[in-house]
């Protein structure tokens, strides 16, 4: 049995490595429709929910090529209908390139689709669990 004594630990930072912080900041500012809450040349953090942050980081003064640039980032919306609406909104606009990996489909957890950020990280949009 695992010892669960003491304070609970809650994950409150999702960090992804990027090769170009400025380009990725612009991309996520568009995707999240939010301004970052913390900005440096190598690290930028966006508010998520509660005290959680979503952050992008170069990995150092120069991007480290050996660090994999692959994560799956989840965006959960209230309903499957909202998933379809957001897909249509993102793919019809012309200001930002949206790379569609998989168009909306229904999986075991409901409607979902996949896009890619500029570094190849997968962004999955799906309904709340």
Curated annotation (Swiss-Prot):
Top-level taxonomy: Bacteria, Pseudomonadati, Pseudomonadota, Gammaproteobacteria, Enterobacterales
Keyword Signal carried by entry: no
Gene, per the UniProt record: ehpR
Residues given in the record as D-alanylgriseoluteate binding sites: 42-43, 57
Quaternary state and interactors: Homodimer.
InterPro entries: Glyas_Bleomycin-R_OHBP_Dase (IPR029068), Glyas_Fos-R_dOase_dom (IPR004360), Glyoxalase/dOase/EhpR (IPR026275), VOC (IPR037523)
Domain of life: Bacteria
Protein name as annotated: Phenazine antibiotic resistance protein EhpR
PROSITE patterns recorded: VOC
Residues of the VOC domain: 10-128
One Pfam assignment: Glyoxalase
Native source species: Enterobacter agglomerans (Erwinia herbicola)
Knocked-out gene: effects: Loss of D-alanylgriseoluteic acid resistance.
Function, in words: Required for resistance to the phenazine antibiotic D-alanylgriseoluteic acid (AGA), an antibiotic produced by E.agglomerans itself, and thus protects the bacterium against phenazine toxicity. Probably binds AGA and acts as a chaperone that works in tandem with a membrane transporter for subsequent antibiotic secretion.
């Amino acid at each position: 049995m695992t010892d669960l004594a003491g304070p609970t630990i809650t994950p409150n930072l999702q960090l992804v490595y990027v090769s170009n912080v400025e380009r990725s900041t612009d991309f996520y500012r568009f995707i999240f429709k939010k301004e970052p809450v913390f900005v440096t040349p190598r690290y930028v953090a966006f508010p998520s929910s509660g005290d959680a942050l979503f952050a992008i980081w170069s990995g150092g003064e120069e991007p480290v090529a050996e660090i994999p640039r692959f994560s799956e980032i989840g965006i959960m919306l209230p309903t499957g209908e909202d998933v379809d609406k957001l897909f249509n909104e993102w793919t019809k606009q012309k200001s930002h390139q949206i790379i569609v990996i998989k168009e909306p489909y229904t999986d075991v957890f409901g409607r979902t689709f996949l896009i890619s950020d500029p570094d190849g990280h997968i962004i999955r949009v799906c309904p709340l669990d």
